[in-house]
Amino acid sequence: MKKLKKLFAVMLSLVMVLAMGITSFADTNSATITLTGFSEADKVEYMQIIQKDETKSSGWAFANNAGACFTEAFGLVDSDDTQQQVIWGLIQYQDKNVKLPNGVTAEEATAAKIDLALSKVAALTGFSKATNKESIEVNAAGVYAIKAEETGFTYKTATAYVGFGEPYPTLTNAAVTAKKSPTSVDKTVADEDHVVAIGDIVTYTIEAYVPFIDAANTKDRTFTITDKITGADYYLTGPNSVSSVTMEGKDDQVGTINVNDDGKGFTIDLNSLVADTDNPNAGKKITVTYTAKVKEITVENKAGSHAAGVDYGADNEPVKLFTGELVLLKYGDGNVNNSLANAEFVLYKDGEEAPLTFVKENNGKYKYAPNTEDASATLVTDKNGMIDVEGLDVGSYHFEETKAPKGYSINTDGKTLTLTVDGEVATANLYNEGGLNDTKLSALPATGGIGTTIFTIVGCGIMIAAAGLFFASRRKENR
């Protein structure tokens, strides 16, 4: 019995070697492993991997085929002897001052070897499903492997050590905290109401997390972040541009945004962050910030990631941006059914001195086109008396008439229309419409008619007749 107690005392140093938790005294024949951070898991499973065995030099032995996983991870040929060497190595890993009994050899343990072994253990059959995600009840001393699954997260296989207390063979309780990394990829845009104008430069942010990749996976240690965009062009260089890939705890850039050949997406290679099987970066947040220039009336953007052969973010909702549309109806004589074609306007945004410029599309609409060479400020009503402009941001806009249709006068009042968001965030393109009446030209006094001509002719006739009578009477007198 003394020998056994000595062995058990030595094994107490194994506590915490494999992420073992705080222990407390339990009932003689049972112990509780308290679980922290597992409550949201879809499934929690556990299995004993080291058990008491007085026939072994350490007093412990691997259980449920876990020994082969450890010897393989430690680079040893599997046998009872090599398994004992691994167990003694685990003891010394925790306490370098432990003195080994004569004739005992310990295989050096490292964090990488332990993680590799546990990743192999996780693939074994024989795990039991925990009915309670906050605690597990066990009735034997030893080391227990605990694994979990949760949509949107990867879990590192955890271990808990249930030891012996006083009086022997009282079992001690244990506690273990989950170590998990989100696989989610979150996308946001700086424009809070999600309404922009064509030509605007908008800033996007992607947040993702370095995944935990099993140490056993040495061939496919990959991690990339991807992005797809429609309705805008990536704007990574130039005034007010942003292109940044950072990781928490590190000042320098950890990656570069590489735009695809078609310009509709990009990829960021972050393989270097997961190359180490020790997973030192697992769970650290990656922040990608970049700018894009709006070119269409709607913009759709979606991010994802790829880690160890698995794609994440496929179910993410894309981030959408919208623009506004204004429609003006030009009519005459107070009758909205009397639409007027060929009226000309310019459009001003409230607070700006220069009129906005547009390009006319094949569908007859005018698309906002700032700083575009072939754009024009002139807007002309179509055969239906309509002007339809799109690609505008929220705000008030004023239509100023510059040329009235033939036979009508300019309405100097113009028309002001406003684009507003219904709620905090737009869910569709904004729209507003209004009409503007023109009146016919007023009648002016006629010119170029007979006027006084008839009177002039009559007067001249009278004068000629009078002159004739005068000369006739003179001639008569002379006779």
Question: What kind of region is each of these model predictions?
Answer:
Residues 2-479:
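Solvent-exposed loop/turn and edge beta-strand elements of beta-rich ligand-binding domains
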